[in-house]
Swiss-Prot record:
UniProt cross-references to InterPro entries, sorted A to Z: ZapD, ZapD_C, ZapD_sf
Pfam families, per database record: ZapD
Tree of life domain: Bacteria
Annotated NCBIfam families: PRK05287.1-4 (NF003656)
Presence of the UniProt keyword RNA-binding in the record: no
UniProt keyword terms in alphabetical order: Cell cycle, Cell division, Cytoplasm, Septation
Species of provenance: Burkholderia thailandensis (strain ATCC 700388 / DSM 13276 / CCUG 48851 / CIP 106301 / E264)
Gene3D superfamilies the UniProt entry points to: YacF-like, YacF-like domains
Function recorded in the entry: Cell division factor that enhances FtsZ-ring assembly. Directly interacts with FtsZ and promotes bundling of FtsZ protofilaments, with a reduction in FtsZ GTPase activity.
Protein location: Cytoplasm
Similarity-based family: Belongs to the ZapD family.
GO biological process, one term: FtsZ-dependent cytokinesis
Protein name (database record): Cell division protein ZapD
Lineage summary: Bacteria, Pseudomonadati, Pseudomonadota, Betaproteobacteria, Burkholderiales
One GO location term (cellular component): cytoplasm
Length: 251
């Protein structure tokens, strides 16, 4: 099944963007080639931009504290797996402590590093990081892969508490949902929400159908419409019945 996720608010949208960027960063920083480390570094700049939203850190701390207060009363409950509960609570408490230790504006260490700032300003220009534009950056790219990797890890470290917090919130949101099998008649599906608030919608479709879900929602109803993309033309609506799995997640 192919999984598509649709955020219902700006906070979850931001966390999904951070998750995607950190996954890309983790992949490329683990590689050996200097060009792959260039992608890792420019991705780190993107992470800094997204994570630099003024209220993101405080939002994450409030949400983690809310989850901690929700889960803590289950300690000692015989119907709850205590080892799993303690692991989650320990993870939340450690991440809260790490967030509290973050000082200043998120990503400021990248801005204050004049060398990285020069790379960042050139990286937004098409072809702007050629060796004649940034000879010092080109020289760094000739260093051993492990040395480059250590540098990038050092620059990313101040952002890791935000990554950890985002991953916890997204994981708890995803685990809150229950998948149901539904059918989009002639490619279209709608469902009443009865005013209940959700943070995230997941749509899983069989890959062999080669359809693409498009979704929208308000506090009363959600819509899922399936399209197909063929060659160079824009996706078009399909008129076949599409079986899929729908999950609504609510923290």
């Amino acid at each position: 099944m192919i999984l598509y996720e649709y955020p219902f608010n700006e906070r979850i949208r931001t966390l999904l963007r951070l998750e995607d960027l950190f996954e890309r960063f983790t992949f490329f920083v683990a590689q050996e080639d200097a060009r792959e480390h260039h992608v890792a570094l420019t991705t780190l700049f993107e992470i800094s931009e997204v994570a630099g939203r003024a209220d993101l850190k405080s939002d994450l701390m409030k949400e983690l504290e809310r989850q901690r207060q929700t889960l803590a009363p289950f300690r000692g409950n015989p119907g709850i797996e205590q080892n799993a509960l303690e692991a989650v609570l320990g993870e939340i408490e450690q991440t809260l402590a790490n967030l509290a230790q973050m000082q200043g504006k998120t990503g400021q260490h990248l801005i204050d590093n004049e060398w990285l700032a020069s790379i960042r300003s050139r990286a937004v220009i098409p072809g702007g990081t050629c060796k004649f534009d940034l000879p010092s950056y080109y020289a760094w790219q000739q260093w051993p892969a492990e040395q480059r990797r250590q540098d990038i890890a050092k620059w990313s470290m101040p952002l890791l508490p935000l990554r950890d917090a985002a991953m916890i919130v997204l994981r708890l949101a995803r685990e809150s949902g229950q998948a149901s099998k539904v059918m989009a008649m002639q490619g279209s599906y709608q469902q009443m929400l009865s005013g209940r608030t959700y943070q995230l919608m997941q749509v899983r479709v069989p890959p062999e159908l080669r359809v693409i879900p498009e979704a929208s929602a308000n506090k009363y109803m959600l819509w899922v419409r399936f399209t197909a993309q063929d060659g160079d033309v824009r996706p078009r609506a399909v008129d076949i019945d599409v079986p899929f799995q729908l999950t609504l997640c609510n923290l």
